[in-house]
Every structure is written in structure tokens, then in C-alpha cells.
């Protein structure tokens, strides 16, 4: 049975916290049951470095919850221990001994070694390469990690889109060692359409889309998660007439416009069950939207589907509903449905987030300027806010109880926003700080804010900074701002994604395929990592980034320039910071389950320069599963 993740105890701003003595919890959910998490292995990787071989592995959230800091590690090469004393300051090790070998690690608890880890994943070329099955003219748009076979190592599910009209979308699964597991052909119901605004009307089985002819579709309609608690992730996807699974079976429907939600076996690519989507908007055409996962009852993961249909002049009016589902291993059952009232002022963005904004142990669904409660009721609409392309929710201010959000506002097609951005209380929707337009703007482009980001990029100021893509540095809404201290720079770094890459706890920035570091003293950036031979995709994004192997820092998954393979990159920067794997943090892991326009990753505790200790997660494993951290 799945149990809810216990959120943090109330944080009261104090001098000790602001001095960074510890990372205080942000809210309280008294004695909430524990959420079930994936039974991950050590995620050990071996990467060539200038001195020899850099090793990195996971501290599991399950063992940190049980033992806290009383965990050390021994590192082995070909069965011989390399370290003189157990490793305690990080979960990394630099091996400078000559020759190649098979690396493993063992945890040490109370002086007793635990079982040996699986052998390290070899990044012999500085990355792990995953060859893609032949599909001429296709590119990878998104990737979803999931443990499809239950062995503790993530596999990768990818969506592949054609740049040629009348070609189906493809959904494929691969191991990190390069084995193709299966392919699902989404069929004629997913064919890429002509470009232009009309391309925002998705084909019934479309899974994402932003090709040269695909317009600006952002309908992912895929997610990957273990819903039934058997230790293996399922794949959830929109399907329609003609969708063909790995075993050759097809979806057949009375009309090509009919849409379904299919549950796919993550290991075999075969369909396990399917249900039709709600038909509320069927008269207006097919629905696009987003998929994600949320713990709506605080115990079980549920599938969240957001359905969006475009109507009216220039297809510029949206009708939106949420349908949630539960899967017990056999049946996909509707949970609740919520149709967003047209008069509510609720306005969708290009993605959703599933986050426990009120810290009661149950996840809410955030969609731009509004939040839907875990029971399918409207929680709030941010006063005065409209549509934007990016929003972020996390513990941005360690001195303030609860979670905060930052969102930007877009001006286009004659729609003029009231302000360019806003920083707000994620629980109530109250705007805490609101940006201002230039006084002398002349047209939409002068006040359109296409991107906004947040991260701890200035260690001199407690908490996170936030900034936008506003080009005019003299504009009142431009520059870098700190959540407590206001404007701290008139210039800005790149504005695509926040990433944890180097050895400190501050944020770096990911743009295209490179990582850059902001220097607050000079108000400039410098590239600290830039791989060769790979490219970014739509909106300068790679298919995925996140903590999928190694220690708590994040990896980058990029497609090769010839579109024949994916490459997974991990950092080799030394660190003195030891954190449990981010993949076993509730908000962080659920952030992987949503797509649309790819957004930055966050934890639901404060992770920044001031962090000294993070709260123990209240998590457990599925019943009957042997712990990865058990004794040998």
C-alpha cells in the first residue's frame, strides 16, 4: 500500500536559520503516513577523470531516514577495498590506482558492512551512450525515467517526433546500457499536422510536438510511474484508433477522433488496459494536455490527466478539465473530474506541477495561475494573473514558512498582462512581490516575458534569486532579485533551467546543452560544462535532466547531432556535500512525471547555500520488497 510522504515541520524564521546552521522544515503534517518510493540501487557510476576514475553513488532516502548521518561507505575495485577509512563526507571517491576494474560500494552502519552494490555503470567515454532504434527523420523530444523491470536502475522512455507530415509519433523504452525494450507506434491518430496556429489542435494520439511543421503543440500525454505498487513502473499514454503496441495488437475505435488512456506494461510495451477520456469537449475536437502523477489521497499515486480543447476565434479560447485515475494492477478507474469554470479566471500555462502546497501530505495540481485541490476543487486563482510560459514552486525562502512560487506573464495576440511577473505564496496564491511594466512600452513585445527562472545563484543573500528574460535592463521588472533582499543585479544569467552540477549547494544554470555558473561579484556567467556532439531540441531544452544516477547532483540526457543516440552526462566535480538522492524526494520525483514545456527541478525542502542538514524523508518501500540497503 502507498502511504503519504510526511512533510516538514513548521519553520520559524530565525537568525540561526538565516545563518545557514540547518535546513529547517517548511511546514507540518502531523504524523502523516509514509509514501512509497522506488527501491533504487546505489546508482554507482565510474567516469574517467584527469587523475583516474571518478566514482559517485546514491545515499538512499530509505537508509537516511533510518540511520541519518550514521552511514559510511567502503569502495572496492575488483574486490579490493580502496579507501583506508570509510567514506563519510560525500558519496564520491576519486580512484587514482592504475588499471581498469569492476567497482562496487558497501554501506557501513554501526561498524557492519551492508550488501555489495551492483557493479558501476561505466561512463568510459565520459558519458553513457544509448543507441536509438532506426527512425529516419525523427528526433527525441522528451524522456521519462522509470524502473521498468524492478531491478533498482532506471530505464528511459522517450517520445520521438517526425519532421515530415503524416508520420506517427513513436514511444520507445531503453535501458541505460543501450538495450531497446520496445516501441509503440501511436498510429495515424498522432500524425504531425501543418504548422501555424491550427497546429495547436493536437491529433487524438499525439504525444508532444514542436517540430518545424508541428507548430507549438506542447501536449505530452505520457507519464511513467509505478501506480500499482509492484515495484515496476507502468507507462501511461493517450492512444487512438490505430495505435500499435510492441506485440502487434492495436487500438480499434468506432471513430478516429475517439481518445483513450492506455496503461502499458513498462517492461514489454504491451497494453494492459485502457479507458476512454471524458467526452465533455468532444464536440469541440480532440483534446491535448498533460499527464502527471500525484498522491491525491496521501497514500496512493494517481494518474492526473489535464485535457485542453481550443475553441473560438483563432482557436484562442481554452476549455480545460482534469480527470484523475487509479490503477490497481488490473483496472484503470476514474477518481474524480474537475471542469475548470470559464468565469473563474483560471488560466493554463504550458505545463502542470503536482506539489503538496498546503503541506497536508496530499498533492495539489498547479496549472499556471491556479491550483486544484487534491479532492478536485478549485483552491485559488492568483489575483490579476493570466497566461505565462513558466512557473516554479519550491521552498524558495528558508526564512518563511511553506512553499513559494514564481511565475512570468506573456503578452501576445493582443492580450496585455497586468504585470510581467509575480512572486507568490504557493499555498494561498497571495502575490508577495509583483513586477512592473515599463512606463513607456509601445507594443506587445516590449512587455512580453517569455521565460523566467529561479535558483540560489548568489551566496551573499539567503534564499533563492529569480529573474526573467526581459532584455531591457533598465525596465523596472528586469534584473536578478533575491526573495528577501530585492534587486541584487541589473544583468541576468541564462533563463532556461536551474541545475545542481558542481560541488556546492548553490544552483547552476542549464541552457541548450551547456552548464554555466553565475558570478555575482562581476554579474557575469562562465561555462563550466559543455559536451560536444550533442544538440538541444525544442525551446533549447534537452529531453531530460535530473538525478538518475550517482550522488545527489543532476545528470543531463542529450541527443546526438545525428539523432542516432542519447548520451547521459554526469558531473565529475568534487564535493563535500552529502545528501540523500533527490529521486526519493516527493516534489522532485513527481516533477519528472510532468512535461509540456520542460521546467526546472526542485525539492520540497530548501536546498541552497545555507543548507547544512536536510530533513529525513518519511518514506517506505512497497510491501514485500527487499531493501537495497539491507544487510548482505
Spans of features found by a protein language model:
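Secretory targeting and sorting signals
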Residues: 1-30
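Beta-propeller-forming repeat regions
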Residues: 33-43, 52, 59-66, 74-90, ...
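General nucleic-acid-binding
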Residues: 46
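Short, surface-exposed binding/anchoring microloops in extracellular/periplasmic proteins
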Residues: 49
Amino acid at each position: 500500500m502507498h502511504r503519504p510522504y510526511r512533510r516538514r515541520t513548521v519553520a520559524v524564521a530565525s537568525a540561526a536559520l538565516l545563518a545557514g546552521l540547518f535546513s529547517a522544515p517548511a511546514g507540518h503534517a502531523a504524523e502523516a503516513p509514509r509514501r512509497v518510493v522506488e527501491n533504487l540501487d546505489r546508482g554507482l557510476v565510474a567516469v574517467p577523470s584527469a587523475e583516474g576514475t571518478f566514482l559517485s553513488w546514491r545515499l538512499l532516502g530509505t537508509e537516511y531516514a533510518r540511520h541519518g548521518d550514521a552511514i559510511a561507505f567502503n569502495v572496492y575495485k575488483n574486490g579490493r577495498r580502496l579507501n583506508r577509512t570509510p567514506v563519510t563526507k560525500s558519496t564520491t571517491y576519486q580512484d587514482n590506482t592504475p588499471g581498469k576494474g569492476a567497482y562496487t560500494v558497501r554501506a557501513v552502519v554501526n561498524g557492519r558492512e551492508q550488501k555489495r552494490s551492483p557493479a558501476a555503470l561505466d561512463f568510459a567515454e565520459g558519458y553513457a551512450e544509448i543507441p536509438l532504434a532506426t527512425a529516419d527523420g525523427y528526433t527525441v523530444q522528451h524522456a521519462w525515467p522509470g524502473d521498468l523491470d524492478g531491478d533498482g536502475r532506471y530505464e528511459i522512455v522517450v517520445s520521438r517526433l517526425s519532421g515530415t507530415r503524416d508520420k506517427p509519433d513513436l514511444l520507445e523504452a531503453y535501458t541505460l546500457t543501450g538495450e531497446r525494450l520496445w516501441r509503440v507506434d501511436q498510429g495515424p491518430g498522432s500524425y504531425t499536422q501543418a504548422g501555424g496556429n491550427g497546429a495547436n489542435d493536437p491529433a487524438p494520439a499525439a504525444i508532444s510536438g514542436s517540430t518545424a511543421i508541428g507548430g507549438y503543440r506542447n501536449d505530452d500525454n505520457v507519464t511513467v510511474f509505478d501506480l500499482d505498487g509492484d515495484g515496476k513502473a507502468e507507462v501511461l499514454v493517450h492512444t487512438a484508433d490505430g495505435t500499435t503496441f510492441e506485440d502487434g495488437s492495436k487500438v480499434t475505435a468506432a471513430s478516429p477522433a475517439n481518445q483513450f488512456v492506455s496503461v502499458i506494461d513498462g517492461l514489454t510495451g504491451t497494453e494492459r488496459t485502457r479507458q476512454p477520456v471524458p467526452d465533455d469537449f468532444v464536440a469541440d475536437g480532440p483534446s491535448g494536455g498533460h499527464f502527471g502523477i500525484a498522491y491525491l489521497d496521501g497514500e496512493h499515486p494517481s494518474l492526473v490527466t489535464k485535457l485542453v480543447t481550443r475553441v473560438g476565434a483563432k482557436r484562442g479560447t481554452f476549455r480545460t478539465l482534469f480527470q484523475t485515475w487509479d490503477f490497481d494492477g488490473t483496472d484503470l478507474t476514474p477518481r474524480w473530474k474537475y471542469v475548470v469554470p470559464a468565469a473563474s479566471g483560471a488560466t493554463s500555462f504550458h505545463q502542470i506541477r503536482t506539489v503538496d502546497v498546503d503541506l497536508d501530505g496530499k498533492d495539489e495540481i498547479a496549472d499556471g495561475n491556479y491550483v486544484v485541490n487534491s479532492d478536485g476543487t478549485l483552491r485559488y486563482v492568483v489575483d490579476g494573473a493570466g497566461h505565462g510560459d513558466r512557473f516554479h514552486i519550491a521552498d524558495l525562502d528558508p526564512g518563511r514558512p511553506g512553499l513559494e512560487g514564481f511565475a512570468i506573464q506573456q503578452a501576445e495576440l493582443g492580450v496585455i498582462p497586468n504585470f510581467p511577473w509575480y512572486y507568490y505564496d504557493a499555498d494561498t496564491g497571495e502575490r508577495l512581490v509583483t513586477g512592473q511594466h515599463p512606463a513607456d512600452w509601445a507594443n506587445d513585445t516590449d512587455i512580453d516575458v517569455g521565460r523566467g527562472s529561479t535558483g540560489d545563484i548568489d551566496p551573499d543573500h539567503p534564499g533563492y534569486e529569480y529573474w526573467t528574460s526581459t532584455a531591457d535592463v533598465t525596465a523596472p521588472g528586469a534584473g536578478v532579485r533575491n526573495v528577501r533582499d530585492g534587486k541584487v543585479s541589473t544583468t541576468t544569467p541564462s533563463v532556461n533551467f536551474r541545475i545542481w552540477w558542481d560541488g556546492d549547494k548553490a544552483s547552476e544554470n542549464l541552457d541548450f546543452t551547456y552548464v554555466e555558473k553565475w558570478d555575482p561579484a562581476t554579474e557575469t556567467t562562465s561555462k563550466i560544462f559543455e559536451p560536444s556532439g550533442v544538440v538541444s531540441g525544442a525551446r533549447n531544452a534537452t529531453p531530460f535532466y535530473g538525478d538518475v544516477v550517482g550522488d545527489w547532483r543532476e545528470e543531463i540526457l542529450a541527443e546526438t547531432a545525428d539523432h542516432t543516440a542519447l548520451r547521459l552526462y554526469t558531473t565529475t566535480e568534487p564535493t563535500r556535500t552529502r545528501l540523500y538522492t533527490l529521486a526519493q524526494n516527493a516534489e522532485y520525483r513527481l516533477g519528472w512525471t510532468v512535461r509540456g514545456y520542460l521546467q526546472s527541478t526542485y525539492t520540497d525542502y530548501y536546498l541552497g547555500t545555507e543548507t547544512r542538514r536536510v530533513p529525513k524523508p518519511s518514506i517506505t518501500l512497497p510491501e514485500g520488497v527487499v531493501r537495497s540497503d539491507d544487510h548482505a
